[in-house]
Amino acid sequence: MYQGQTSSFLRKADQKQGDFVDSAQPDPNAELYAWHYEDSSLPDEDSLLRIKVVGFEAELRTIGFEYHEPSSTLFVTNHGRQGSRIEQFNLDLERLTATHVRSIIHPLVSIPNSIAAVSDSEFYVTNQHHFTAREHPLLWAVETYAALPIATVAHVRVLENGTIDAAVVARQAYPNGIVLLNKTTLAVAATSKRTVNLYTVSPAADAAQHPGLELSSSFWLPFLPDNLSVSKGDGALLVAGHPHLPSLSKFSRSRRICHRPEVLASQGQEVQDMCGGLGTASWASEWTPGGGVRHIYAGWDYPTSASVVRDRERRVGIVAGLYAKGLLVWRD
């Protein structure tokens, strides 16, 4: 989910795009929508509009994307069966089309999760693990629960000739959400450590080099941080995440049945009651250099909070759940 800097549109991935369940039949491809949230009186059919994807026929299994508004560039992570990569699109919000430009494939973009765009040809990306759960399940579990600082943050450039140039600029435990707070500060969630790391960005020495990152500080959260964003209008760092891992795990495993009506209909009453009664908590907070951490929402009414954005000018905030149907919206 992403909020533009000047537009009153919210861009989001369809929250029902897939549950990433091994050996299960894949869901239909992810979809992209634009939501005009400025006028709360508009019905959904007038405010929530599907973006047509043009020139892309492959699988699209996304868990994160980034919109670079000055260049109308949309970067989308893709974990299809063809291998992990990042898809680049040109997004036309007037025509509601996303035209595919290229697939960005590189060995250092191995498990792309979240993206922080610098331009239409440059970005930072988190690879949430060093080991993949599919190829190395035991090592993946050890890396996750021991919070080993071996996963990477990569800096990626698309050169003028189309070559992909990438370098590892930081290593940490479970790098998840990432966002540029300003030109010299990059924030990265460390999910398994319940912290957000703040890195100082040093410019590259020359055109052939990559920028440098130096860890300057961190702050702790009472939940597992997922995605990050910058609040429009006041510049606060927004963080959404998961406060109760056992219920999140149970909820996520159940979605391959509970989110598929055709499967749920064939189950007994006990399973249907289970789907109706399962829940998990959400938490969203903000951080500022002067005020520290302030909590925005914590509760069980809306499940699996993964992203939070806010528009101070229009007095609206939005939380998106990893496995939720719909969005949590508040208005001041």
Regions found by a protein language model. Name each.
Residues 27-30, 54-69, 105-123, 130, ...:
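Beta-rich, blade/repeat-based domains predominating
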